[in-house]
Amino acid sequence: MLEVIAKIREEALARVAAATSSEELEALRVRYLGKKGELTRVLRGMGKLPPEERPRVGQMANKVREELEGALKEHRENLSRREQAERLRAEALDVTLPGRPVTRGNRHPLYQILNEIKAVFIGLGFDVAEGPEVESDYYNFEALNLPKEHPARDMQDSFYITEDVLLRTHTSPVQVRVMEARHPQLPIRIIAPGKVYRRDDDATHSPLFHQVEGLLVDRRVTFGDLKGTLMAFLKQMFGEQVRVRFRPSYFPFTEPSAEVDMSCVMCGGSGCRVCSHTGWLEILGCGMVHPKVLSMSGYDPEEVSGFAFGLGVERVAMLKYGIDDLRLFYENDLRFLRQF
């Protein structure tokens, strides 16, 4: 029996030393030390031995078991270190290589245009002001010389939340809020960009669109100041070659009022389908702040005057980029958006 144990020891140690993987070591452990392993069978057969041989056989078998367990453990640790080293070599990173570029999106074309508009007016000395999109009927209409039952209210189909609260139909309420907050400070020179809401939805209208309101209030402000400001803006946005004209119009919150046209950016003013062969495109509305609006905001119209204007960001973007359908800006089509 001692010779059998010695043979098992020699064979097992040789196989353990030659093993090349953790799986192979586990198979050897089961073969020699498992419940049905070769060394286990020897120990179970000790009952058949003469009593005087049992101590020596048991002692040797236990010694071989401990030796095999130690060899398995040591070789397993060596294999683990070797496998880890190989894995680290395979996964090694060259930290001197440039990193993978981060894929970033672009600003939406409307906000690109809005940022351009803001940059031009900031360069002209205007501040940027903001106001609530959910507005009271007073600030949206009455404070802008649009009392209840005024026929001009029919020009703006509105989204009412309650009888006296609605989604603002223009950013003009911001001018009243700013004048009230800054009274009697002069000058007031602001633009108010933001979202506005009207019940329109077709190729040239959207129920949600973006508008920029402009306001300047000071002593001795004239219509000439308004013209000079808007001409400077349009030339910076569309190029020095653009021509500008002012047509008389009507807005309840300005008097006198005007529509501003510029020479068609598609044909240069020679006439085309886009400008209906007139050579001109409407771009914004403007005028001198109505005396009632000034007085309702706390200013004396005999002492101060001002001008205001409003333009649609989508309108500017459509003209600048030659787009004929407003809805393209809101359809989230990446083929369209990636062009900007």
From Swiss-Prot:
Name of the top EC class for this enzyme:
ligase
The listed locations are: Cytoplasm
This entry's comment on the bound cofactor is:
Binds 2 magnesium ions per tetramer.
Catalytic activity annotated for this protein? tRNA(Phe) + L-phenylalanine + ATP = L-phenylalanyl-tRNA(Phe) + AMP + diphosphate + H(+)
**InterPro entries cross-referenced by the UniProt entry:** aa-tRNA-synth_II, aa-tRNA-synth_II/BPL/LPL, Phe-tRNA-synth_IIc_asu, Phe-tRNA_ligase_II_N, Phe_tRNA_ligase_alpha1_bac, Phenylalanyl-tRNA_Synthase, tRNA-bd_arm
Chief location = cytoplasm
Give this protein's Gene Ontology molecular function annotations.
ATP binding; catalytic activity, acting on a protein; magnesium ion binding; phenylalanine-tRNA ligase activity; transferase activity; tRNA binding
Q: Which PROSITE patterns match?
A: AA_TRNA_LIGASE_II
Cofactor or coenzyme needed:
Mg(2+)
Its BP terms in the Gene Ontology are:
phenylalanyl-tRNA aminoacylation
HAMAP family (UniProt xref):
Phe_tRNA_synth_alpha1 (MF_00281)
The protein's name: Phenylalanine--tRNA ligase alpha subunit
Q: Which organism is it from?
A: Moorella thermoacetica (strain ATCC 39073 / JCM 9320)
Gene name as annotated = pheS
